[in-house]
From Swiss-Prot:
Disulphide bridges: none
First-level EC class: isomerase
Species this chain originates from: Mycoplasma genitalium (strain ATCC 33530 / DSM 19775 / NCTC 10195 / G37)
Pathway: Carbohydrate degradation
Residues that coordinate or bind substrate: 8, 64, 170-172, 191-192
InterPro entries assigned to the protein according to its UniProt record, in alphabetical order: Aldolase_TIM, Ribul_P_3_epim, Ribul_P_3_epim-like, RibuloseP-bd_barrel
Pfam families, A to Z: Ribul_P_3_epim
Annotated binding of a divalent metal cation, by residue: 33, 35, 64, 170
Coiled coil ranges: none
Record's keyword terms, sorted: Carbohydrate metabolism, Isomerase, Metal-binding
Active site residues of this protein: 35, 170
Note accompanying the cofactor annotation: Binds 1 divalent metal cation per subunit.
Protein name: Ribulose-phosphate 3-epimerase
PROSITE patterns: RIBUL_P_3_EPIMER_1, RIBUL_P_3_EPIMER_2
Length: 209
């Protein structure tokens, strides 16, 4: 399967632009990365807004839960028809809770993923890898956009490639580093790096990656 670009909506948090997103859709973009945060990352992001607008345009939505208070959040996004995939961070939870959450998402017909900080030892969570659909590897500290790519993520990326899992990488991806990453992952999340591209660059990226 070819690597897919997923647009992080985070740069549009305070300036949602439907016409811009419609132009991205016309360019070939189909997937939106939708960040949800709480005190786990000492920040806030989206709280359910704009999902109807994204559905109207035609986007599928991948929800990334960077939260400690997860049950109300996960139940809400499970109810949203254009949310196709949900990942949540492992760091706040026990293994028993992670198992419970995986089961909850799968029972509701969504793809489920586990998300990891680049400082988290991926190998410790290997027992879950046969029960999930994908993993999200953070290549920046979670909690805000526009950060620089941290090559420490390659430690977890090498481990992840030993397993039959879809891999999503999130944070600091730009045109100057995408080539060293794309061969190892299935989904590349881009936010500010995508917005800064000229239209022809976006179209080329979406067609050739």
């Amino acid at each position: 399967m070819a690597t897919k670009v997923v647009f992080s909506l985070l740069p549009l948090l305070n300036r949602f632009d439907k016409s811009l997103l419609e132009s991205y859709f016309q360019d070939g973009l189909r997937l939106i990365h939708y960040d949800v945060m709480d005190q786990f990352v000492h920040n806030t992001a989206f709280k359910g807004e704009y999902l109807d607008e994204l559905k109207t345009i035609g986007f599928d939505v991948n929800v990334h839960l960077m939260v400690e208070q997860i049950i109300p959040q996960i139940n809400f996004y499970l109810s949203q028809p254009n949310v196709k995939r949900i990942s949540f961070h492992v760091e706040p939870f026990s293994f028993a809770k992670i198992k419970e959450l995986i089961q909850l998402v799968k029972e509701n017909g969504k793809e489920v993923g586990l998300a990891f900080k680049f400082t988290t030892n991926l190998q410790l969570y290997q027992p879950f890898f046969t029960t999930i659909d994908f993993i999200t590897l953070m290549s920046v500290p979670p909690g805000k956009g526009g950060q620089a790519f941290n090559e420490a993520v390659f430690t977890n990326l090498k481990i992840a490639n030993h397993y039959n899992l879809k891999i999503e990488i999130d944070g600091g991806i730009k045109v100057n580093n995408i080539d060293q990453i794309k061969a190892f992952v299935d989904f590349i999340v881009m936010g500010s790096g995508f917005i800064k591209l000229e239209q022809w660059q976006r179209q080329k990226l979406l067609q050739t990656i």
